[in-house]
C-alpha cells in the first residue's frame, strides 16, 4: 500500500494525478507539450534526462518507466548506470554530456550551480533556449520523483506490467494520448479519493 490508505488502489503517477484531475490536468498538458517541444534536446534526449534524474533520485518507478521508454527508442538500458558512474566515459553523444553533467548537478547539489556549468553547455553548441528546456525536464522529473516517493507509490512499481500494457510505445506517441487512453479504458479514477478526514492510525 501507499502511505495514504485511501490511495491504496493507486499504483502509478498517472493514477495519482488523475485522482485530482481538476488540479493536475493543466500540468500534464504542460508535460505533453514539453516532451514534444521542437526546441531543445530531442524527444529521446529528454527521455534520457528524465530517466537519468530519476535514477539519481533512486525513484525506481520513474526510472523504470522512462528507461523503458528510452529502450523503446533504441537506447541501451546499460547506459544509465554508466552515466551514474562516469558521464565522460558513458556511451552517449558527446554533445549531450555537458547537459547531463548540468542536470546531475542540478538534481544533487542545486545550490552549487555556476555560470561555468551553463558555459560548458554553450560551448558544446546548446543555445539558451535549449538549456532552459533541459532544465525544465530535469526540474519536472525531480518533482515527479518526489511525488512518487512522498506518496509511497514507488514500492508498488511493477516494470513487467508497464511493458505488457505497451506503455513505453504509447508514451512515445504522446503523453496526452496515453493519459486519454487510460481514462477511456477505466484505468484511472478521475473522481479520486474523497476521504477528507485524517486516517485512523
Mark where each language-model region is:
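Hydrophobic alpha-helical segments
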Residues: 1-201
Amino acid at each position: 500500500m501507499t502511505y495514504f490508505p485511501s490511495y491504496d488502489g493507486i499504483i502509478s503517477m498517472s493514477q495519482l494525478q488523475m485522482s485530482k484531475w481538476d488540479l493536475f490536468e493543466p500540468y500534464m498538458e504542460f508535460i505533453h507539450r514539453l516532451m514534444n517541444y521542437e526546441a531543445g534536446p530531442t524527444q529521446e534526449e529528454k527521455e534520457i534526462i528524465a530517466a537519468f534524474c530519476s535514477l539519481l533520485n533512486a525513484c525506481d518507478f520513474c526510472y523504470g518507466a522512462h528507461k523503458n521508454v528510452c529502450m523503446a527508442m533504441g537506447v541501451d538500458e546499460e547506459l544509465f548506470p554508466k552515466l551514474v558512474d562516469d558521464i565522460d566515459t558513458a556511451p552517449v553523444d558527446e554533445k549531450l554530456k555537458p547537459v547531463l553533467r548540468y542536470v546531475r548537478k542540478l538534481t544533487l547539489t542545486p545550490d552549487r550551480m555556476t555560470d561555468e556549468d551553463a558555459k560548458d553547455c554553450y560551448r558544446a553548441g546548446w543555445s539558451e533556449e535549449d538549456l532552459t528546456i533541459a532544465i525544465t525536464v530535469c526540474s519536472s522529473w525531480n518533482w515527479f520523483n518526489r511525488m512518487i516517493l512522498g506518496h509511497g507509490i514507488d514500492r508498488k512499481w511493477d516494470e513487467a506490467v508497464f511493458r505488457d500494457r505497451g506503455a513505453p510505445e504509447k508514451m512515445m506517441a504522446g503523453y496526452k494520448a496515453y493519459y486519454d487512453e487510460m481514462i477511456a479504458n477505466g484505468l484511472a479514477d478521475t473522481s479520486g479519493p474523497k476521504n477528507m478526514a485524517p486516517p485512523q492510525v
